[in-house]
Amino acid sequence: MDDSDTPTYYLQIEPQDGCHPGDSVERSVTCLPSASDENENQLDGDGHEHLTSSDSAMGKPQVSEQDSLNNNESCTLSCEVAAGENLQNTLCEASRDEQAFLGKDKKIPGKRSPRSKKGTAKKIPPGLFSGDIAPLMQEKVLSAVTYAVDDEEAAEVNANEQPEAPKLVLQSLFSLIRGEVEQLDSRALPLCLHQIAESYFQEEDYEKAMKFIQLERLYHEQLLANLSAIQEQWETKWKTVQPHTVTALRNSEKGFNGEDFERLTKICATHQDPLLSKHKIAAVEKSQERKCSTQLLVSEDPKEGGATTKESESKTCLGTESSKESQHTVEPLGSSPCCHQMDVQTDSPSLSVTAGKDHMEELLCSAEATLALHTQSSETAGSPSGPDSSEDACEDDSRLQLAQTEACQDVARIEGIAEDPKVFLSSKSKTEPLISPGCDRIPPALISEGKYSQAQRKELRLPLRDASEALPTDQLENNELNELQQPDLTDSDGKSPQAQADSDGSENVLCGNNQISDLGILLPEVCMAPEEKGDKDDQLNKETEDYLNSLLEGCLKDTEDSLSYEDNQDDDSDLLQDLSPEEASYSLQENLPSDESCLSLDDLAKRIEIAEVVPTEGLVSILKKRNDTVGDHPAQMQHKPSKRRVRFQEIDDSLDQDEVGGGSCILLVLLCIATVFLSVGGTALYCTFGDMESPVCTDFADNMDFYYTKLLQGVAELKHWIYLS
């Protein structure tokens, strides 16, 4: 089939951004198949296929990329892909007309150019939401917000774009609100109202924006009223509950403490919702996560991928549809930036294999699938769209077969090593590969014996492209299988497509640019057998038990010896009182065994105890008191409490509290009288020998005249009463 012929079953759709062939921005062509068996899933691997100026001048239409999924196999797989994108959120119907309608906007996640981020939201019928739930509606609202983000970016790129996408967003939000009203479930209603108000505000239709923001405010006011009613009901219930049940519930609660509640209170009191930018970010992140999960779902089925690649290879070798197959890129891994970091993580669970042949067969299938994908990507990138593409594809197919046979041999070798009981590995090895940023060498945690000592080490030397992709070598199967899979990823990511098409296929897959040196860096001390570890653990446990038993016996002996020494000390108490503390401790230490080599830590501690227990003058020993209770010294027992009684009686002989209070009152009155006399006398002295005409002295003279006349009158009346009596 000649490339110059224009296929009649492809329909070219012009983009709606107002661009023309003469503009600087390249035209993008979206092709829709009309046949029922054609693949409808358009692959957006690196944006739309752009027509260069020369191709557009010659009038050659290029077919956009397609993925390797067959739409006629199952409807659920296409639904999973559509749900992973989650930008249109349409339901999967059984009819072919509905699938053809959905196929216009359905795309496998991949890299997106800034031009391909324009919002192409479709109208969502209200009937589709009759069976959905509120969280799904919230996700759909967030998808509508994603369209708003894409519309803003598109407006920045192209200023001549007509404002059709915001209208589509508003229509989708209106359909959401209709579904909410029908279901009588309004949890997503305030979010819809806020997004509609934001859309009208951006369009400068402030009247409608104010109406919808007022509706949102009414919703939240009613929500607050309902919450306050619920709170009042709970408070009344709380007051009627008995106290013991409340404490039981409080003791059973162990999840949150005071700090957690303070943090939550601070967050609830300082949040700035509703804020559109925050919802935008959340929507974008959510859509990217769904893209990643969809890619993982697509890439987890290696057998179907292998089958489709084999079919495409046969078509390419026959040369019937070389122009179509040259455009195919069936490798979704590493296509989007957010999913590139998850490639190694998705390989590790699929390659975490226990010992068994079934898992080895799965490995073989996945290895074949990745080899096929790698070779096909080299075909698509390196081969031109012409008659030579079929020859190059056939050559690459032969290289692929050689690489697959070599991969089968390596897998068989790994099976032999895994089944050999002589090769053993530490179950809980704490060593990790020592990897430097610029080094591609790994010290394996493998100990082999016999025939696997040197020969198998040389066979197991496999390349590792990036040190950051090195996985833990806890088991032999994981180690070798990961090293088989990692060259495929590194070759598809790191090498140029032309170099992949020209180089040998088997060397590209199993031997990379970097080679690992001799596997001689082993740690036999750490990688020991589990049985030897168990024996050593038992021995350590026995030693610790013996040591603890000896400590307990030593402590009991020490207590007995201390009691015996206390008895001897009571007998010689008179002698010890005449000596100084140093001499007493020295004399007591002489009673201990003289052989220093036989002394243990317990004996030394016993010496310290005896030195501390030595009584001094004026102090009473606690141990002596304990021994006195037995009945050795009853006279001393009666004598000591008597001394204490005498001391308390001395305190009781002091002044009574009432007497002390009366004396304090008399003292206070005397102090007041003395203060009055001192003040009056001081003022009189100042006025007598100082300034007589000062205002203080004049006031003082008037007061003295007044009080003096009063005093004279009182004295006269007193004399009169005395005379009468």
Curated annotation (Swiss-Prot):
Extracellular side: 686-725
Regions crossing the membrane: 665-685
Subcellular location: Cell membrane; Golgi apparatus, trans-Golgi network membrane; Cytoplasmic vesicle, Secretory vesicle
Region (Disordered) location: 1-72, 103-124, 296-353, 375-397, 485-510
Bias kind Basic residues: ranges: 109-121
Signal peptide feature range: none
Any single GO BP term: positive regulation of Golgi to plasma membrane protein transport
Cytoplasmic side: 1-664
GO molecular-function term, one example from the UniProt record: connexin binding
Keyword tags: Cell membrane, Cytoplasmic vesicle, Golgi apparatus, Membrane, Transmembrane, Transmembrane helix
Flavoprotein recorded as keyword: no
Cellular component, GO annotation: intracellular membrane-bounded organelle; membrane; plasma membrane; protein-containing complex; trans-Golgi network; transport vesicle
Any single Pfam family the record assigns to this protein: Consortin_C
Compositional bias annotation for Basic and acidic residues: 300-314
Stated role: Required for targeting of connexins to the plasma membrane.
Subunit composition and interactions: Interacts with connexins GJA1/CX43, GJB1/CX32, GJB2/CX26, GJB3/CX31, GJB6/CX30 and GJC1/CX45. Also interacts with GGA1 and GGA2. Does not interact with PANX1.
Similarity remark: Belongs to the CNST family.
Protein name, as recorded: Consortin
